[in-house]
Amino acid sequence: MSIPSIVYKAHATGNDFVVYLDAEGTYEPTADEVRFLCDRHFGIGGDGLIRLTHPQAVSDLNDKQIAVCAADNADWFMDYRNADGSLAEMCGNGTRAITLFAQRQGIAGQPGGEPFRLGTRAGVKVLTSLGDVPTLGKDVFQVEMGSWKRGDLDGYEVTIPGTAGSARGTFVDMGNPHVVAVIEDAFSSLPTVEQLDLVTKPVVAPRIESDQNVEFVRIDEQSEGDNEGNAKIGRAHV
């Protein structure tokens, strides 16, 4: 196998990953190995796999991507793979999980220290360790995610195989692709948040070539002044 003999399990707000350090750049996993390790019945189990390595050791990066990391002083790279073995731009929860792992390995700074500059396929992310925060929990990080972009409002149809109904979804680029579907409104015929089947992979049409995350959102309250609402979210990782 092209993975080390010791790997670890990490999570951020329940989004869990198999992680390992590859300082020498000798353990780039195959898609089959990622699927095996992330299998929840026969492997370790996880939403994805993260290899912490140097940008030069990631075979799918081009010279420009490596140069961006170097210019932004990102010596370490988050080589993130989805549980199905496919490559992914990055994962917001994953950036925190792998930075905590980097702390434990003596690579990233401790709380109050210098921010950790982490290379990803979506550019360099900067994480600041805040330590334990009473109102937020243990091992809290502030992440500079960069700019985001929204596509056409309600430009996609979201369905769940085996579940009647559909909802309209809006594309949001957070460095990795998301489609956000508002349910329990006039344009959705899907069940309520509590009744949604989040085990089955949602279908997004028209199809997005890179695949995407899907978020289902219910608007509970909306202020007349600022158009900001409080929402409950059920997340399906795709």
What are the functions of these language-model segments?
Residues 136-148:
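Membrane helix-loop-helix hairpins that form the core translocation module of multi-pass transporters
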Residues 160-191:
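Internal active-site segments that recognize and position negatively charged phosphoryl groups
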Residues 1-137, 180-235:
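A glycine-rich beta-to-alpha transition motif near the start of alpha/beta enzyme domains, typified by
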Residues 142-144, 169-171, 234:
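Active-site-proximal beta-strand elements of phosphoester/diester hydrolases
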